[in-house]
């Protein structure tokens, strides 16, 4: 397949070699497992984690006379994905046989789509940053195509010293192969691309995105060249299943190719594997070309055809996607690009935030979700679906602050109590004496005492207004964080005769 490079050189991405600058060019073929109860051409289950060879039909095992039947839900999921990628949906596509031998491929061929894929060109917009000025840069990564294919089985080599085993549970599972254009110029962009693509798939509900289960695997194509020169010879790094590993593999492979070229060598078009333990790639074979697979239309499957009305009906049911939600958070709620970007990283986080933000100040809610909730989740290695602090509880904590019943500091203590113990918020505040002190007389007594004990700072305050904050902090400490901060600030300024 001929790839056309249209992105101009950018010195920010150049790699310095011993003989001058180089540019890395990256494309990606992402295999995303479709969310479906059954496989692409059989009724066997797709559930992960079953005992070996428990989810295998006669079709998956390639028994003679068994004919494939297309799973319509997999077709719908592929179209939904294409729409989410703003791609061309092809109303007619064809299944081909991709011929090669491997022990975990019982048919001796893989059913795929080569000449006429179900989805054509699209795009994914990634956001790089923030830079030193807090700015983000949007970069558009082109999608060449999306086609459907069936997964192979799994060869297992570590169960016996002299024998290998084959598990066909995965054989026939529906995959979407999403092929990007060679538009990425750094490992950072590649990681941002796979992160964004995974995010879109999860929002659409077409792939669960669980990389640790193999639901998303990436073949990363890497080449290097002098800036402005034609594309170099690419090497393909197969089946990288971690975003961090994708970045490490690209960094190593780019440096390896540069070293070979600067030493007077040539790059062979290879298929390589990434060794995570050694953080390096190694060759496994010379790269195959399309003609090596002898593609031809599968005679057991008719061309796949549907009309535009079918596509339009699916388009009308699409959920709101990350970029649209991010724009709404920024434009309607006044969030920063940074905060909005964090809140959309996972659909569950965005949903949680929106539940809490309903009828409340979006910026304040964002601050609590990002700093307190996500911080607690990371600290406790917990997913947001399992958080002990539910959206209505966090919303109630924020309401108590807004009503002046508790201070911001006490609110954080209350959050910790709910996280670890649960319980009724207002009852906890009442029983544990957490209510905010609003009695001006009591606060004034604390202010007077602190000023009496620190006459030197009182005398310096008019020249150093920043000391107001120190006095406020001392009063808050003296009252156990229960004093109303606004009242404290007002009284301190009045006592110090500072406007």
Swiss-Prot record:
Name the Gene Ontology biological process terms: glutaminyl-tRNAGln biosynthesis via transamidation; translation
General function of this protein: Allows the formation of correctly charged Asn-tRNA(Asn) or Gln-tRNA(Gln) through the transamidation of misacylated Asp-tRNA(Asn) or Glu-tRNA(Gln) in organisms which lack either or both of asparaginyl-tRNA or glutaminyl-tRNA synthetases. The reaction takes place in the presence of glutamine and ATP through an activated phospho-Asp-tRNA(Asn) or phospho-Glu-tRNA(Gln).
Gene encoding this chain? Answer: gatB
Superkingdom: Bacteria
Question: What Pfam family does this protein match (any one)?
Answer: GatB_Yqey
Q: Where are the transmembrane segments?
A: none
Source organism per entry reads Bartonella bacilliformis (strain ATCC 35685 / KC583 / Herrer 020/F12,63)
User: What's the name of the protein?
Assistant: Aspartyl/glutamyl-tRNA(Asn/Gln) amidotransferase subunit B
What keywords were assigned to this record?
ATP-binding, Ligase, Nucleotide-binding, Protein biosynthesis
């Amino acid at each position: 397949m001929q790839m056309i490079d249209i992105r101009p050189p950018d010195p920010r991405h150049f790699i310095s070699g011993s003989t001058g600058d180089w540019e890395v060019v990256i494309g990606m073929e992402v295999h995303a497992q479709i969310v479906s109860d059954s496989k692409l051409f059989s009724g066997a289950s797709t559930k992960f984690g079953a005992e070996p060879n428990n989810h295998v039909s006669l079709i998956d095992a390639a028994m003679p006379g068994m004919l494939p039947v297309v799973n319509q839900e997999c077709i719908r999921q592929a179209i939904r994905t294409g729409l989410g990628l703003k791609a061309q949906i092809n109303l007619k596509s064809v299944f081909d046989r991709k011929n090669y031998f491997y022990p975990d491929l019982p048919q001796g061929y893989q059913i795929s789509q080569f000449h006429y894929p179900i989805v054509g060109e699209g795009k994914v917009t990634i956001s790089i940053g923030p830079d030193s000025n807090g700015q983000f840069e949007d970069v558009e990564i082109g999608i060449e195509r999306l086609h459907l294919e069936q997964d192979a089985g799994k060869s297992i080599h570590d169960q016996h010293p002299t024998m290998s085993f084959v598990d066909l549970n995965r054989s026939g599972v529906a995959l979407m192969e999403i092929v990007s254009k060679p538009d990425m110029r750094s490992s950072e962009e590649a990681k941002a691309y796979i992160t964004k693509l995974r995010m879109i798939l999860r929002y659409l509900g077409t792939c669960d995105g669980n990389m640790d289960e193999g639901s998303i695997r990436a073949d990363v194509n890497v080449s290097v060249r002098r800036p402005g020169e034609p594309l170099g010879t690419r090497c393909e790094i197969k089946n990288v299943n971690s975003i961090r590993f994708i970045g490490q593999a690209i960094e190593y492979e780019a440096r390896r190719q540069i070293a070979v070229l600067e030493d007077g060598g040539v790059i062979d078009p290879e298929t390589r594997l990434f060794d995570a333990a050694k953080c390096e790639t190694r060759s496994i074979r010379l790269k195959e070309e399309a003609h090596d697979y002898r593609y031809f239309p599968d005679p057991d499957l008719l061309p796949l055809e549907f009309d535009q009305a079918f596509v339009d009906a699916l388009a009308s049911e699409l959920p709101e996607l990350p970029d649209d939600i991010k724009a709404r958070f920024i434009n309607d709620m006044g969030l920063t690009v940074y905060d909005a970007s964090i809140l959309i990283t996972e659909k569950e986080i965005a949903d949680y935030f929106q539940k809490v933000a309903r009828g409340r100040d979006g910026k304040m809610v964002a601050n609590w979700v990002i700093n307190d909730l996500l911080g607690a989740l990371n600290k406790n290695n917990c997913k947001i679906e399992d958080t002990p602090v539910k959206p209505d509880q966090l919303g109630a904590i924020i309401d108590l602050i807004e009503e002046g019943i508790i201070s911001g500091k006490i609110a954080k203590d209350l959050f910790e109590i709910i996280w670890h113990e649960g319980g009724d918020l207002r009852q906890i505040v009442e029983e544990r004496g957490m209510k905010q002190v609003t009695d001006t007389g009591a606060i004034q007594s604390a202010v007077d005492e602190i000023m009496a004990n620190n006459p030197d700072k009182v005398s310096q305050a008019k020249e150093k207004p920043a000391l107001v904050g120190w006095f406020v902090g001392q009063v808050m400490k003296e009252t156990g964080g229960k004093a109303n901060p606004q009242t404290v600030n007002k009284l301190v300024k009045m006592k110090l005769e500072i406007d």
